[in-house]
Amino acid sequence: NFSYAIDDDDENQVTVDVLKNFNLTIEKGSFVAILGHNGSGKSTTAKLINGINIAQSGEVIVDGQKVVDDETIFDIRRKVGMVFQNPDNQIVSSIVEEDVAFGVENLGVEPEEIRKRVDNALKTVGMYEYRLKAPNKLSGGQKQRVAVAGIIAMKPMCIVLDEPTAMLDPSGRKEVLSTIKKLNKEDGITIVLITHYMDEAVQADRVVVMDGGEIKLDDTPQNVFSKFDEVKSLGLDVPQSTELIHRLGLKSENTILNADDCVEFLKKTLEAKV
């Protein structure tokens, strides 16, 4: 439970609460999507988890450690990796494998172990064959996967991704989301995904909806998007399939979240009317 505020006007020292009495527990190994319109506090939450920002009241605890000062920040950032929106802002080397190795080298890891970690990380995200390429020759989706590989190589327990697909085309978005899901399901890495895309959010185990620095909804994708009017009132969309079923005035036992379920439901509905 914590709060965070900023000075909106330096001259008059106007303080604006970004997060108020914020209480969020994320289970190890889970996949949580955080939704909210611009200014709702999503990115601030991400930076508090990683220790980029420090809570002004209350506590942020990661794996039993309080995120409070320089004594714990280093350990916290080893455990919680971050991937940001623009992949170009995260590239620090002219060779892919050197870029992935950058963070690990700063941890003081032995060269032989660095080599092993870099290779494994690139294989995990499907970018091993590009290890000797220049990052500026890659697509946006490939660059973002390289950024994820750099985090994986540091062996974090959690990865926070702040709108990692916002600047990517549909193909790039699909690549990155597939990688995220693989890391969660196969490697057990906790994923916190901040996104504007509902089709990404529905693939999480849990969806948290924020507004005005507060949590308004916190449940499974099924239960969150079943609250159609409430989600809309918070300035958010719902998955396209959910929207279609609602506009058709149809009622389903379970909330329809994706195209496959939508097709199956419509097929059964039409057959029942014949």
Residue ranges of each PLM-predicted region?
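Conserved ABC ATPase signature
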Residues: 134-138, 142
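Catalytic Walker B motif of ABC-type/P-loop ATPase nucleotide-binding domains
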Residues: 159-162
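Conserved ABC transporter NBD signature motif
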Residues: 58-68, 76
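Helix-to-loop junction immediately C-terminal to a conserved catalytic motif
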Residues: 50
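The feature captures the beta-strand-to-loop junction immediately N-terminal to the Walker
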Residues: 35-37
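Conserved ABC ATPase "signature" region
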Residues: 112-129
